[in-house]
Amino acid sequence: MTRDLALAHLTTITLSPAEMIRVAARTGFQAVGLRLIQVTPTSPGYPLMDDPASMRATRSALRETGLRVHDIEFVKIEPGLDVSSLESFCAAGAALGASRIIAAPYDPDLGRLADRYAALCALAAGYGLGVVLEFFPWTVVPGLAEALEIRRRAGAPANGGVLVDALHFYRSGSRLADLDGQDASVLPFLHLCDAPARGGD
């Protein structure tokens, strides 16, 4: 069985979506993940929902190459997040043919975090999108077990899952046993990374 490989935008974050799609096609990928929301002041985002010309160029590149958009990112679930403000983001994802949204846990109130995750899943469902929560060792949801617990507290939405990044999985001390018995819909895809399993000093 073969599986599609998608190029994550962070790998080539200085390239516009259209440029990145063409690079992905030339290097053998079948899909891409696009960063539509800026994450840090020093790392760009490409808000296609607010830029019709760039949206047209991106869709043209998809038609030209035959690639598809696998996911869009990056929703930081923070204390002040208004989920309804993500309507145009979700609409852009649907227009691009994306299947999932990547979200990250940056609210120290775990109950509120679970509620916002559930609300994002509900909003995304209206656009035919799923949502995956990516865990990071430096956040309040540092590992796989904690991310699965947030999903449970959110009511285990049908379109809600967890994203395992191999780098964060090993650096967080998550256990392979925690993967056992999980339905594929809960862990729909994973991120592969060639960084060292342990960080430097």
Predicted stretch roles:
Residues G93-L110, Y127, V132-F135:
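Active-site groove signature of glycoside hydrolases
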Residues D51, D82, D109, G143-E146, ...:
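Intrinsic-disorder/low-complexity, polar/charged segments
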Residues S43-P44, L81-D82, R112-L113, G143-L144, ...:
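Short Asp/Glu-rich motifs
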Residues P17-A18, V83-L86, A114, L144-A145, ...:
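Conserved strand-to-helix beginnings and helix N-cap segments that scaffold or border functional pockets
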Residues T11, L36-Q38, K76-E78, Y106-D109, ...:
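Active-site-proximal loop/turn and secondary-structure-junction residues that shape catalytic pockets
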Residues M1-R100, A118, A125, G161, ...:
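N-terminal pre-domain/capping segments
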Residues R3-L7, A119-D201:
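Acidic/histidine-rich catalytic cores of soluble enzymes
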